[in-house]
């Protein structure tokens, strides 16, 4: 950063005592410096409204004297601007340019994600997210290791990976690590987190063997990457005429990891007809029954929904927050337990933390509802489903088919 003497105008020079680029603290120090400048410049000098979001410190909300709100999202050295007034955004960009040496980029591309706008029908725009360039570059690196057949699903139906499976030797682990297993798994993770939610279960399974891969894990990782590559022009779609409030679907498998007895759960939060957050993960605790696993999954999904509600509220986007966010699951006992307090031999041992979902229902933040198993779109986050089910579930979750805007609760007695 260039600085000049306030009286003489002479350029000042600094002595670098320590190179922090690559240091674990470098990103934090840079973010701290950047935020102090933003607060000083926009809040005190320009008299703008300034608010660094508590729910996500990477987000800063700036409000001009005209009352126009703009969003600044900072990813270390990549910054995105979003808002409804282009002039205000260009003004903010110019303030950054005067202080830092910045290069303006094409907003269609960011962190390997391509964003396109199109009309799905007259006066109904949509935003489509894809990763074609990223997947093409990654696939070329490992093309000779891929099978020629095009997979119809990310994972073989019913596949389940766990540490110590197939009794692989240390030599086998080292072989697949040298082949680039971790790089492929990382690429799959980036794709699954951004444009391929249907690959989240398989990627979570593969990442369990990140340090000690075997042939089965290698085949699954290559299959997921191949699946993404052949669907690289497909992605997530958000529609202007889609459901304009938060909805959440959650589910859990009852098939446990043989090494620790813990099952896989998953959830997805949707808005404007597409997913805005999703996850597939192994439970932290052993589930004794299917309803126990489902109830724990509901608790995790509730925490994600509560965070999202508070973030949207902080962004002054309260119109997208329903009075009570619908939480859709397919287990009667889990739904009932979240709605009323009842102690039975089957649930009296549940850890207290998992009753957080009941508190959210009681306070009116969420509304738990029972949906049919075939309409539970989070099912694909808990197991490797057949192609016909993956197409049915995936098309809805990714915004290429309509979500139910209103799912009436089932009467449970």
Language model: regions and residue ranges:
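Conserved pre-motif C helix in the palm subdomain of viral-like polymerases
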Residues: 1-4, 8-93, 99, 134, ...
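Electropositive, glycine- and tryptophan-enriched low-complexity nucleic-acid-binding patches
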Residues: 270-291
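Catalytic palm subdomain of template-directed nucleic-acid polymerases
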Residues: 24-25, 62-101, 116-128, 208-215, ...
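Structured nucleic-acid-interacting core domains from mobile-element enzymes and related host factors
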Residues: 226-252, 321
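Polymerase palm active-site segment centered on the conserved acidic dipeptide of motif C
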Residues: 46-55, 80-140, 225, 229-234, ...
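C-terminal reverse transcriptase regions that engage the nucleic-acid substrate
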Residues: 16, 20, 105-233, 372, ...
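RNase H-like nuclease module associated with reverse transcription
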Residues: 209, 244-245, 284-413
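Acidic carboxylate-rich catalytic motifs and surrounding loops in phosphoryl-/glycosyl-chemistry enzymes
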Residues: 48-51, 57-58, 104-116, 151-153, ...
